[in-house]
Amino acid sequence: NHAAVLIWSCGNESYAGEDILAMSQFFHDHDPGRLVHYEGVFHCRAFDAISDMESRMYAKPWEIREYLESHPKKPFILCEYMHDMGNSLGGMESYVRLADEFDQYQGGFIWDYMDQALRHTDALGRSVLGYGGDFADRNTDYNFSGNGIVYADGAGKPAMQDVRYWYDTPARRAAHDARNAAAAARADRDAAKAQAARKPGTLTVTEGDGNLGVRGDGFEILFSAGEAGPS
């Protein structure tokens, strides 16, 4: 594999100054065909010339809109956004819609693509992906390194479905929505038929725990009740 350099970066989270300006000038002088990026100029406008684009981390959609509506000289790009840690990545639609409305909105880079984890053997002898706190470590960020849209072994997370959907074309998203609506309608009809055909009766759990599950298209909705019944 060979790296494909699209944009030169002057670093990350280092404010701005003469040294970073000199780096930007070096890139412009020796490789004028490529753009130069640096987010830090947002915090220090005296060195605004460092970056060829306006760049922010985790800017809110309305903040980006405010910038784009001000008739700026530079296009806007999010050098980091979404931060897919835990059950996150919600609200991507608000960012994608900006691309449909403003030519100067260049999208962003999800932080990040893949979890950082180490495979180890847990207390039950299973080989698992370990994060902070799984190695008898006391001072830890726990799963802070688990913020990718794929797991450390490359398997896709649920968030990947949302990314795939919103990064698709509007026409393909509409077709996807139509398929989902048709599938939901079929499921409703099937459930109504099953309910109508069901014989009256009672369900009794006499001992132990009770689990009721409904399996769908890649999902499982599970209800669990202990011996004392649902709370």
Could you tell me what each predicted segment is?
Residues 72-73, 104, 208-209, 215-216:
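Short, well-ordered loop/turn elements at secondary-structure boundaries
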Residues 64-66, 96, 200-203, 210:
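Generic recognition of flexible, low-complexity loop/linker segments
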Residues 126, 142-144, 152, 197, ...:
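Compositionally biased, low-complexity repeat tracts
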Residues 175-208, 220-221:
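Mature N-terminal, pre-catalytic/accessory segment of carbohydrate-active enzymes
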Residues 1-188:
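Extended substrate-binding grooves/exosites of carbohydrate-active enzymes
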Residues 211-231:
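Acidic-aromatic substrate-binding/catalytic surfaces of carbohydrate-active enzymes
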Residues 143, 153, 157, 199, ...:
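Low-complexity, intrinsically disordered regions enriched in charged/polar residues
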